[in-house]
């Protein structure tokens, strides 16, 4: 049994402990400051200003423009939060109607709500005046990239949800470009609540031409400069680069990446995509102020309206105090926009989203000695950020996370009316139990689920426009990771496979499940949910696909690279691992089954091998590992990427022993958490992965770009690839399997999840899963 398998149990135990613990980081040695309790309970007032409304509850005061539904002012604690605006990316257009949907005069000041509706049966939607793309289309920098034609014989195609590699085709227009879409945006303010709700309803009538959004989000843009601390999760909770230092930085590789030449993080690279997040796991995220000791945070009370399901990773902020809440986008290859054809009646309600404000009751100020120490250590790689700042901002974020739990627990909201939003009695709860049936698994695997994710999604369908889903590698077939059109309902199951999916809208769905330690996916079609009728699916047998006896494995399948070296939350999001890889593994990787440890001997991404170290900051103590201060700009101010950013081909070797001559078919199963650059059939194209065995090439994986490397993450849209070869190529004794990434840009290559070699020698028949489960959607050809 391999060492990787022996480590399997202990790693899962650690993972289970982590998942069961609170996401809120708590210092062990001292108490955090207290967050001020809300004591104001004034009635909500609504003032009509002619071209706008002002909503005020004595805690939050906001002004909504009638012409487009944007916020022009947002005041908390006497501080104007906005310097540019807060808005939905696609604004109401066409025939615009502004109205009061909840008048506080009719409910004793308990709640006020205003609405701006744009009816647009055929004109392209107005672009945002603050920078949104015309008609919600995709900016040029985010236009989808397409996979090449289906792999030739002997090449491995993607085997994740959605099937074989997409077919080649011409690029369709980005965004609706003249399509019709009615958009209504609403803002709601309650008595005694330190925050407000906002939501939008998108409507496409059957008579409208095709329409859609390449990306869509709610944005709080360019807040007051007082907001200088970003909180995403326990690992990314920090003082941020100032506007001035960001402007002074030198662009490297892409406009959103800059080498900082001044400030706290001088000699580091700042990149907005370092602050991406898995939307399904995100609790509360936002900015706070070390000066004014206030915070503002976004909360999604539900994930039902977010495209891409629980695997959707997205950008949640821009630099300079901007908050983002994407409900659909092409980032990382998932939930890639929505595309509504002519003839379809379609509605989609996004939100209500909650925007939360808080303030400290007893926060402390940094001393002059603290500030002097910070100044003295700026640019060193270990800036001495004052502990009082850490405590203050952590207290604010902890409070926001606690608030998010209450906001989520109250979903769905009884006060929402007039849009396509069923209340509690118009929804249903779906329950059941998945039973793992994997008789061919190594004995140590067990029958419990360390982490099970299960959900209901729209049945697979053919994408009418063919663009964004092709980027994700499944042609025009849209499956849940790539669906931005329809609602999805997901939950975490228990270790024994039991699950409860609450608040499901009526409809017909496919049930999907995936779990740590189980390669592939469970799916059951034709699940019909009726309003107010609980649905118990009973016990559901899940027999994962196996093509033969397991010979070895590296890692364990969990759709991320976090189990591998540097793939964890302390590291993966930092820009520059493509440059630093060659210093960490100067001779690349040789991994020996039964001896090597994937946690330290297998890097989380395989990229071209750079032979330059011109990027190293000579003052850095550990340039290959430290978070900040590891890079130095060469003389001049031009982008150094042409000199730094190219690497030669990289080959990793896996050594393993076979006891005797083999016969039959060997099947290599490669699960990739992400990839970049491999949208071609030519194995020399950067990003593709060539596989060799004992000096002979056995195939090439033509990967599908997800921007996981370029955009600093340990996962994109997950794909599994199958490579068959004649088992006679395996020899008695030591064998060497190689994985080669071609020369190219060091942000191309693959992000690893899991590898497994199986052998079918014909001595046993391996059952084909039932059609209605399709754990590994495509069949093995």
What is each model feature region?
Residues 47, 87-156, 162-207:
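Extended, loop-rich substrate-binding clefts of extracytoplasmic carbohydrate-active enzymes
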Residues 220-348:
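A contiguous, surface-exposed recognition patch within enzymatic or periplasmic domains that forms
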Residues 516-545:
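Structured interaction patches on ligand/partner-binding surfaces of diverse proteins
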Residues 496, 638-663, 671-778:
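Beta-strand-rich ligand-recognition modules
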Residues 27-88, 171, 177:
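Beta-strand-rich N-terminal accessory domains
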Residues 428-439, 497, 540:
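A short, amphipathic beta-strand motif
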Residues 461-498:
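Short, acidic Ser/Thr/Gly-rich low-complexity loop/linker segments typical of extracellular
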Residues 497, 507-518:
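A short, solvent-exposed beta-strand micro-motif common in secreted/extracellular proteins
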């Amino acid at each position: 049994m391999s060492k990787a398998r022996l480590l399997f149990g202990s790693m899962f135990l650690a993972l289970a402990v982590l998942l069961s613990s609170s996401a809120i980081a708590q210092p062990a040695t001292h108490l955090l400051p207290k967050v001020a309790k809300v004591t104001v309970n004034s009635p909500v007032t609504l003032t009509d200003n002619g071209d706008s409304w002002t909503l005020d509850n004595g805690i939050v005061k906001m002004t909504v423009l009638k012409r487009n539904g944007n916020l022009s002012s947002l005041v908390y604690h006497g501080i104007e939060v906005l310097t540019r605006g807060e808005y939905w990316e696609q604004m109401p257009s066409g025939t615009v109607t502004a109205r009061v949907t909840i008048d506080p005069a009719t409910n004793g000041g308990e709640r006020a709500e205003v609405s701006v509706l744009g009816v647009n049966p055929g004109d392209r939607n107005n672009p945002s005046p603050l920078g949104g793309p015309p008609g919600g289309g995709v900016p040029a920098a985010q236009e989808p990239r397409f996979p090449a034609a289906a792999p030739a014989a002997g090449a491995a195609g993607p085997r994740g949800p959605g099937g074989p590699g997409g077919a080649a085709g011409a690029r369709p227009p980005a965004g609706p470009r003249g399509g019709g879409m009615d958009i209504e945006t609403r803002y709601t303010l309650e008595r005694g609540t330190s925050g407000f709700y906002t939501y939008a309803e998108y409507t496409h009538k059957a008579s409208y031409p095709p329409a859609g959004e390449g990306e869509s989000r709610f944005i709080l843009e360019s807040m007051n400069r007082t907001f200088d601390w970003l909180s995403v999760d326990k690992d990314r909770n920090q003082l941020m680069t100032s506007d001035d230092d960001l402007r002074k930085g030198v662009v490297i590789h892409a406009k959103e990446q800059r080498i900082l030449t001044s400030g706290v993080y001088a000699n580091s690279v700042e990149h907005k995509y370092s602050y991406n997040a898995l939307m399904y796991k995100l609790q509360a995220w936002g900015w706070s102020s070390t000066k004014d000791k206030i915070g503002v945070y976004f909360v999604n009370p539900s994930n039902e309206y977010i495209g891409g399901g629980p695997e959707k990773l997205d950008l949640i902020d821009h630099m300079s105090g901007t908050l983002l809440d994407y409900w659909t986008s092409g980032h990382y290859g998932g939930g890639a926009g929505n595309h509504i054809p002519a003839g379809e009646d379609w509605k989609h309600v996004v939100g209500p989203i909650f925007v939360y404000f808080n303030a400290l009751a007893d926060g402390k100020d940094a001393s002059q000695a603290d500030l002097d120490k910070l100044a003295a250590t700026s640019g060193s790689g270990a800036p001495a950020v004052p502990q009082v700042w850490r405590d203050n901002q952590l207290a604010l974020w902890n409070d926001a996370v606690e608030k998010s739990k209450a906001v989520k627990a109250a979903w769905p909201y009884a006060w929402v009316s007039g849009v396509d939003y069923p209340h509690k009695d118009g929804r249903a709860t779906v329950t059941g139990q998945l039973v793992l049936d994997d008789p061919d698994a190594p004995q140590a695997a067990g029958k419990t689920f360390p982490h099970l994710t299960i959900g209901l999604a729209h049945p697979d369908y053919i994408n009418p426009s063919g663009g964004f889903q092709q980027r994700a590698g499944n042609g025009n077939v849209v499956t849940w990771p790539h669906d931005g059109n329809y609602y999805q309902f997901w939950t975490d199951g228990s270790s024994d496979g039991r699950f409860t999916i609450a608040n499901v809208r009526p409809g017909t769905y496919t049930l999907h499940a995936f779990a740590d330690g189980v390669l592939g996916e469970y799916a059951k079609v034709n699940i019909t949910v009726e309003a107010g009728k609980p649905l118990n699916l009973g016990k559901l047998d899940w027999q994962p696909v196996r093509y033969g006896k397991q010979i070895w494995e590296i890692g364990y399948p969990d759709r991320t690279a976090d189990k591998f070296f540097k793939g964890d939350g302390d590291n993966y999001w930092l820009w520059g691992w493509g440059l630093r890889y060659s210093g960490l593994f100067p001779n690349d990787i040789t991994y020996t089954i039964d001896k090597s440890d994937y946690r330290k001997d297998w890097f989380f991404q395989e990229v071209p091998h750079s032979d330059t170290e011109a990027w190293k900051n000579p003052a850095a103590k550990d340039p290959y590992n430290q978070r900040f201060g590891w890079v130095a700009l060469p003389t001049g101010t031009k982008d150094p990427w042409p000199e730094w950013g190219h690497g030669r081909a990289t080959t990793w070797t896996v050594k393993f022993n076979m006891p005797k001559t083999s016969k039959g078919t060997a099947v290599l199963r490669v699960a990739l958490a992400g990839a970049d650059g491999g949208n071609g059939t030519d194995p020399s194209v950067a990003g593709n992965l060539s596989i060799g065995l004992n000096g002979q090439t056995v195939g090439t994986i033509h990967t599908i770009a997800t921007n996981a490397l370029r955009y600093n993450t340990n996962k994109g849209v997950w794909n599994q690839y199958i490579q068959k070869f004649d088992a006679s190529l395996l020899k008695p004794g030591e064998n060497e399997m190689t994985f080669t990434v071609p020369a190219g840009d060091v942000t191309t290559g693959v992000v690893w999840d899991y590898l497994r070699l199986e052998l079918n020698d014909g001595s046993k028949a391996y059952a084909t899963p039932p059609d209605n489960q399709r754990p590994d959607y495509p069949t093995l050809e």
